[in-house]
C-alpha cells in the first residue's frame, strides 16, 4: 500500500493548490474503495478537506444496498458523502453504458468548485479497454488517446491517479489492508463490450504479452501528444476562423487543405461540446453545407444539432421546438416567459422615453413567433414588406426567424423584438425588452 500511496501522492502533488478539496467519485467498487483510502490518507497528511460522491443509477436491484455500504465506509473515515440519484435517457440511441457514464459525470460536475480535484478510480486495465474500444470504432489519434490522467473538469480538474496501476495490484492492496467492496453483477455480463474485453480478451493478451497494458498506455500517450501538437499548430488558424457568435468563416476554411479543415471542424465541435462526428459527416459539412448553392438553405443533421450556413459562415444550431403555433397575451409591466429556453419578454411603460405607442386596447396585445403571411413597415424603410424579406434585410439567420418574438396588436405587427417598431406604432409610451 505504501508504494501505491507514493505513486498517488506524486500524481496529486502536480495539481494540489492551497485551496484544493479532494472529491472522490465513490462507487464502492474495489477501485474506488482503494482510492478513498488513499485520498483520506493524503487529505490528513496535507490538511485538505475530502468528501465523496456516490451516483445511484437505479440500474441494479442492489443499488440501494450499495448506497448503505458506501455511507458506512465513509462514516468510518468521517468523510462526508453525497448521494446523487440519476435517471437515464435511453431514447437517444446510446448504449446503457454510455448513458450511465454521461449521467454520472453530469452529476459529479455539480460538486466541483474552483481548485477542487475530482478523483476517479480508472486504472491501467480500464485504459486498455478504452483503447481497444476506440480501435474497434476506427478512431483517430484523439480517440486512441483514451483517458487522460488529468484534465479540466467543471471549475476544477479531474484526476485519475491510478491510471498507471494494474487492476491486480489494486486488488492486492485492498486484500492486504482488509477492505470490503461492492460487486456490480453487471460486470460479468459479456453482452457489454467492455465486459467482453475484460473477461475474454485481455486475460489472453496479458498472458501472451505481459507488458501489453504498458505498451497500450505508451501508444495512447503518443496519440495524445500528436493530437496536442496538431491543436498547438492549428490554434492560430482556428482563432482566425472562429467568430464571437461561435461560427466558422467559410472563406478562410477554403484556404486550408482538406486534412486541416477536418481537424479544424473537430476543434470547433469539441469547443462547442458536441460529440465527434464521423469522417463522412466531416466531409458533408464542407461539401453539402459550406459549398452548397448561394441561394440554398443547407442543413446537416448531427447527433446533437445541425450545421447551418449563413453569410458565408458555418453555425452549429441546437435542435429546437417548432414554435409556429405558440402565442400568448402580454400584459404591461409583467414579464412573459417564452418557450424553449428563449427567456422572457416584457412590455414596460416608460412615458416619454419609449419607442412604442400604446394602442387603445392594450389587452389585445400578444406575442407570436410565426411570421408567415405577416407584413410590417419599419420607420426607417420606405414601404411595407413581408417579414420574410425584412428578416433577410436585418441579417437574421433562417433558423432564428421563427424564434424571434413578434409583438402583435390584433392581426397587426407592432414590433419585432430587437429589430424594429412598425411606423404605425411609433411613440414614446412603452418599450419592449427581450431578456434571453
Curated annotation (Swiss-Prot):
GO biological process: tRNA modification
Keywords in alphabetical order: ATP-binding, Cytoplasm, Ligase, Nucleotide-binding, tRNA processing
Domain of life: Bacteria
Binding, ATP: 27-32
SMART domains per the UniProt record, alphabetical: TilS_C
PANTHER family in alphabetical order: TRNA(ILE)-LYSIDINE SYNTHASE-RELATED
HAMAP family per record: tRNA_Ile_lys_synt (MF_01161)
Protein name: tRNA(Ile)-lysidine synthase
Organism of provenance: Vibrio vulnificus (strain YJ016)
Gene name for this UniProt entry: tilS
Amino acid at each position: 500500500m505504501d508504494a501505491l500511496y507514493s505513486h498517488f501522492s506524486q500524481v496529486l502533488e502536480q495539481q494540489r493548490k492551497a485551496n484544493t478539496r479532494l472529491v472522490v467519485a465513490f462507487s464502492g467498487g474495489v477501485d474506488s474503495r482503494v482510492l478513498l483510502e488513499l485520498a483520506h490518507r493524503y487529505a490528513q497528511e496535507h490538511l485538505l478537506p475530502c468528501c465523496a460522491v456516490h451516483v445511484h443509477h437505479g440500474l441494479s436491484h442492489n443499488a440501494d444496498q450499495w448506497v448503505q455500504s458506501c455511507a458506512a465506509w465513509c462514516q468510518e473515515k468521517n468523510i462526508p458523502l453525497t448521494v446523487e440519484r440519476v435517471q437515464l435517457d435511453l431514447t437517444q440511441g446510446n448504449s446503457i453504458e454510455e448513458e450511465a457514464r454521461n449521467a454520472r459525470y453530469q452529476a459529479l460536475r455539480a460538486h466541483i468548485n474552483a481548485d477542487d480535484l475530482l478523483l476517479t478510480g480508472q486504472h491501467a486495465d480500464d485504459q486498455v479497454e478504452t483503447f481497444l474500444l476506440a480501435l474497434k470504432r476506427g478512431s483517430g489519434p484523439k480517440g486512441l488517446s483514451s483517458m487522460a490522467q488529468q484534465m479540466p473538469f467543471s471549475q476544477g480538474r479531474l484526476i485519475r491517479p491510478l491510471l498507471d496501476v494494474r487492476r491486480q495490484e489494486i486488488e492486492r492492496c485492498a486484500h492486504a489492508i482488509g477492505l470490503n467492496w461492492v460487486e456490480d453483477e453487471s460486470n460479468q455480463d459479456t453482452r457489454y463490450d467492455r465486459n467482453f474485453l475484460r473477461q475474454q480478451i485481455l486475460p489472453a493478451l496479458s498472458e501472451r504479452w505481459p507488458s501489453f497494458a504498458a505498451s497500450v498506455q505508451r501508444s495512447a500517450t503518443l496519440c495524445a501528444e500528436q493530437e496536442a501538437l496538431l491543436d498547438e499548430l492549428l490554434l492560430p488558424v482556428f482563432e482566425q476562423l472562429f467568430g464571437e457568435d461561435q461560427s466558422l468563416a467559410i472563406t478562410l476554411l477554403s484556404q486550408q487543405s482538406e486534412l486541416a479543415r477536418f481537424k479544424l471542424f473537430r476543434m470547433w465541435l469539441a469547443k462547442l461540446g458536441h460529440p465527434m462526428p464521423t469522417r463522412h459527416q466531416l466531409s458533408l459539412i464542407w461539401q453539402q453545407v459550406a459549398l452548397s448553392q448561394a441561394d440554398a438553405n443547407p442543413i446537416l443533421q448531427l447527433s446533437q444539432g445541425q450545421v447551418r450556413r449563413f453569410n458565408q459562415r458555418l453555425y452549429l444550431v441546437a435542435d429546437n421546438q417548432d414554435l409556429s403555433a405558440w402565442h400568448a397575451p402580454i400584459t404591461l409591466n409583467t414579464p412573459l416567459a417564452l418557450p424553449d429556453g428563449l427567456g422572457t419578454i416584457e412590455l414596460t411603460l416608460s412615458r416619454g422615453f419609449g419607442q412604442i405607442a400604446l394602442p387603445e386596447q392594450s389587452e389585445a396585445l400578444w406575442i407570436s413567433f410565426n411570421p408567415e403571411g405577416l407584413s410590417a413597415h419599419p420607420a426607417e424603410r420606405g414601404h411595407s414588406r413581408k417579414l420574410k424579406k425584412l428578416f433577410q434585410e436585418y441579417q437574421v439567420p433562417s433558423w432564428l426567424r421563427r424564434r424571434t418574438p413578434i409583438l402583435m396588436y390584433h392581426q397587426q405587427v407592432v414590433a419585432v423584438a430587437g429589430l424594429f417598431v412598425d411606423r404605425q406604432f411609433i411613440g414614446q409610451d412603452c418599450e419592449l425588452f427581450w431578456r434571453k
